[in-house]
Structure formats: C-alpha cells, structure tokens
Design a protein with these regions (language model features):
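Periplasmic/ER-lumenal interhelical loops and adjacent helix-loop junctions
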Residues: 36-41, 237-308
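Signature aromatic-anchored transmembrane alpha helix within multi-pass, membrane-resident enzymes
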Residues: 228-232, 319, 370, 374-402
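Hydrophobic, aromatic-rich transmembrane alpha-helices
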Residues: 298-331
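Membrane-interface helix-loop junctions at the exits of transmembrane helices
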Residues: 18-25, 52-57, 128-146, 236-249, ...
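Extracytoplasmic
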Residues: 399-521
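Membrane-embedded helix bundles of polyisoprenyl
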Residues: 103-118, 122, 127-209, 227, ...
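Start-transfer (signal-anchor) and selected internal transmembrane alpha helices
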Residues: 1-25, 220-233, 317-322, 521
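Membrane-interface coil-to-helix junctions
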Residues: 16-111, 139-144, 148-153, 261-285, ...
Length: 521
C-alpha cells in the first residue's frame, strides 16, 4: 500500500478506538470495560485459563467454583484460544484487571485488521476495505454488545468464510485445511458462535456446491484421504468440549428463545446508541423486546446503501453464496409477531443452549460487509462520481455510528479492583485447616429482601486464595445447583447432599460467610 493508504487505514482504526474507548476505558484508561458481573465473570474465566497454563490449576474444565461440581468451565464461553493473549499480558506483570482491559483493546485491533486483510485480499480497494473493517469492528451492532465481551471475539469469521469460498472455487486442500483451523479457533473460544455459525455455513456450502457443481463433482475425490483425516482430527478435537457443553445445565425453552429474536425493523433503524438517532429511534422501541441488544442497524442511510448494493450484487457469481446466505439466515432468525422459522431449528436440541440468539448477527456482519462493498466497487468502477460515493459512504458510516455518551457500560477500575477485597479479608480471617471450601450466604431472615450476593467476587477470592467456593456465576449452572442471588444455608445443604456429602462433613468442612447487604461476617 502507498503511504496515504496506510495512513487512512490506521486513521479509521484510531477513530474507531476513540468511538468505543471514551466509554469503555476513559481518556486516562481509568475505567474497566463493562460491569462487575458479566464482564468480570469473563475476566475470571481468562484468569482460570492463565492459572491452568501456569500449573496452578490442575484441571482445565473443573475450576473450583460451584464446588464440588466437576467441569464447571463448560457452563459458558471458555475463551481458551484468546486466553493466550491474556496470559501473555499477565506474564508481562499486569494484574488481572488491567490485563483484561488491554486484552479487550487487542480484540478490537484483531477484528479490525483481520477483516481489513481479508477484504483487501479479496480484491476490495483499501478505501472500502477500511470502511468495511470499521463496520466489522466499531459499528452500532458491535457497540451494543460490549458489555458481553465474549461477543467481540469475531476475528476468525472473515477467515472462515474466505477459505470456504476459496476451497469451492479452487478445490485446493490448503483452503480446506485453513477453513477447519479457523473454525477450530472460533470453537475454542465461543460455543455460542461456533454453534450459531453452522446455520449460515450450511446455506453458504449448499449454494457454493450448486454454483460450482461441475468442478466440485470433478474434484470431489481429490486429496480425499487428507480431507477425511482433517475432518476426523477436527471432530476428535471438538468432541470433549461438545460432550461437556451439552451435558451441563438445562436447555432453554423455545418460547424464551423466540422472544429474544429481532424484528425486521431492527436491521434498518438504530434502536439506541447512535448520537444522530437519539430521539428518532425511541419511537421504534415498541416494536422490539430489549431493543439495545437487538441493534443490527449501521444507521438508516448506511444500511440502505449496503442492502441496496447487496440486492444489485446477486448477479455476480462469487457474491451469490454470500447474498443467499445473508437473506436466508436473516429469514431464519427474525420473528414476525411470536413466530420465527428458528423454532424449527430448535428441534435440534443443541441450539437450545444458546439463549442470546440475537448475537448471531455478529456472524453475519462479514458476509453483509463483504458482498455490499464488493458490489459497490464493481458498479462504480467506471462511474465519474465514484469518489463522491465513497466519501459519502464514509461520512454516513462515521456520523451514523458515532455513539451516544455513556451508551456503553464501564466501571471505574479502582471499584473493580476493590470489589472483592472485603470478602477476601473475612475469608482469610475465618479460614481454618479443616475447611475444604467456603460459601457466601444470607441469614435466613433476609431471604426475599432482594439482597444479592456478589457471586463473581467469590470466584475471584477463590482464585486469589486458592480456596474453593460453593458459589459461582455462569450461563448454565451444574445440575442440581440452585444458589443464585439469595443463597441460604439450607440451599448449601441441599446442593452438597445432591453431591453425596453427609451432614457431619457439611458442618465441619464448609466455611460459612454471611452477607447482610452491607458487610461480610
């Protein structure tokens, strides 16, 4: 690239970081991206992985929360692959909270430059590739999910689609292998995305086979042995996590999942978060349950331009699989009233593990961006006002995706660093040699008073003191566990008896820490 092109690409990245950074980290990097619960829980999982790599934790799957349950890590996204980045930051001497904050910044960097690389490698010029990378990394749909940091880990997705397309176009084994490598990377990070991506990949594969039918049938047996070995190794590598994931916790009901799907209007109108639409978008809230989480629009103008050129691009052979995938996937995941075609997908029970199905759109971002920008480039190739269209698109993207102040959650990092300290001091003070674990509970008299135990703090204390906790926080709790916001001693007894503990062992081996809403004792 020429020097101007490099400056432009970096400048767009810096603008994106400013957009998300003023809320997530603050000007002085004094804030923690997210809240004290979901976000800090992801931090705990990354810390567990780091501790396992260091040899502090003896089991990867069985972290010592929800004690004495086994395979507690499988209750949510396990972050195995991205924890390598986090672990490097920890080894550099940063504490778990600053490591996490910097890790989030690196995720944005990975998303931006990986998507830019694939877009540009696919023949899209640097200007449109920069715009596309911005939309993939910093647009409203991404900002709407920043409290759920695990949804930011999407950098493998452009590679997955790119290598799958290249395989069907060339029938070369190297693309087949690279597709499975990047799918494995995604799988070792997020069961959510690796499950939901199966639907668009199914449509993409079927469409690609149809349009490349003659070539596909001619070379179907080429490198067949290597392909079979690759598939077998892939399934061997995913099977342990898959079996644990399906057997942990309960499955969501169909009605609960369908309720969380988006309506069609979500794809065009920003519901929340855009400075430009801060008053206009409120009118449309009544059309969508929990609208901020169903933010799929890049802005009314930007979305209109992108989908207009997606429609126009359907005549291009290389874009056809992407475009069919986009519309069929949207059709599957979008509800009309209380009905959605996704209800038929839910007959496959593994899909009931995904409650937050609205996150599927993160997977579809790349196909939408790729096919629309490729179409724009082709239709404006000999157009005199091409530069005007490019600049207009850039301006609309930057203005429509400029976020409202405080539209993304953050917490002062000192508050995060101190949130568990009082509990940790009490546990250290009361701990005795005979104790095998600790639990934070409410006095019976406070049950039903809406006093919530900070469950994530109990997990951090367990990690700091290497002292197992019966408390825990995750998407899917272990079977038999019923100790969430207002746990009492009877809940503890029920849980431990479910795991085969006798009364005497329960009384002697468990350190009880009470919480009255203000202090631990």
């Amino acid at each position: 690239m020429k020097i101007f092109e490099k400056i432009f690409v970096i400048l767009i990245f810096v603008i994106g970081i400013i957009y998300v950074g003023r809320d997530l980290w603050g000007i002085k990097f004094s804030h923690y991206p997210g809240d004290k619960y979901d976000t800090r829980f992801n931090n705990v999982i990354l810390e567990h992985n780091y501790r396992f790599f260091r040899g502090i934790e003896k089991s990867y799957l069985s972290a010592k929360f929800f004690y004495p349950a086994k395979k507690s890590i499988a209750g949510s996204d396990h972050h195995l692959f991205p924890s390598l980045i986090y672990s490097f930051l920890r080894l550099c001497g940063l504490d778990m909270f600053y490591s996490f904050s910097l890790w989030v910044l690196i995720l944005f960097l990975l998303n931006y430059f990986s998507s830019f690389y694939i877009l540009n490698k696919s023949g899209i010029d640097f200007f449109l590739s920069g715009i596309g990378a911005f939309l993939f990394s910093f647009s409203l749909p991404i900002m709407a999910q920043t409290m759920h940091i695990q949804t930011l880990y999407i950098f493998p997705i452009p590679f997955i689609f790119y290598f799958l397309q290249k395989f069907f176009e060339t029938n070369k084994y190297k693309y087949f292998l690279k597709f499975f490598i990047f799918f494995l990377i995604l799988y070792y990070t997020s069961p959510y995305f690796s499950c939901l991506i199966l639907i668009p990949l199914f449509f993409f594969t079927i469409t690609s086979i149809i349009i490349n039918k003659e070539k596909f049938l001619k070379y179907i047996y080429k490198d067949i042995f290597l392909k079979l070995i690759t598939i077998i190794v892939f399934f061997i590598l995913i099977l342990p996590f898959y079996l644990v994931y399906t057997k942990t916790g309960d499955f969501w009901g169909k009605g609960h999942i369908i309720k969380n799907l988006p309506s069609f209007i979500a794809y065009m109108v920003p519901f929340h978060g855009s400075f430009l639409y801060k008053n206009f978008s409120l009118y449309f809230w009544k059309f969508q349950t929990d609208p901020w989480h169903k933010e799929y629009s890049f802005g009314l103008i930007t979305s209109s331009i992108l989908f207009f050129y997606i429609f126009k691009g359907i005549k291009f052979r290389d874009l056809f699989p992407y475009i069919i995938t986009i519309f069929l996937t949207i059709l599957i995941f979008t509800k009309i009233g209380n009905f959605s075609l996704y209800s038929f997908i839910l007959e496959i029970k593994i899909f009931r593990k995904a409650q937050a199905v609205w996150r599927y759109y993160h997977i579809l971002l790349f196909p939408i961006i790729f096919s629309s920008l490729k179409s724009i480039q082709r239709y404006t190739l000999n157009f005199k006002l091409r530069n005007f269209i490019y600049i207009f698109l850039l301006i609309s993207v930057l203005i429509e995706n400029f976020p409202l102040r405080n539209s993304m959650k953050n917490t002062p990092i000192l508050e995060i660093k101190n949130a568990h300290k009082d509990l940790e001091e009490v546990v250290k003070l009361k701990r005795k040699k005979e104790h095998k674990c600790f639990v934070v509970i409410l006095p019976d008299s406070l049950k039903g008073k809406n006093i919530k135990v900070d469950l994530v703090s109990t997990m951090i204390v367990y990690q700091n003191l290497n002292f197992p906790t019966i408390n825990g926080y995750t998407t899917f709790s272990p079977k038999g566990y019923n100790m969430w916001d207002e746990p009492t001693w009877q809940d503890v007894i029920n849980w431990l008896k479910y795991n085969g503990w006798e009364d005497e062992k329960i009384e002697s081996k468990v350190l009880k820490i009470y919480f009255d809403g203000e202090k631990y004792y």
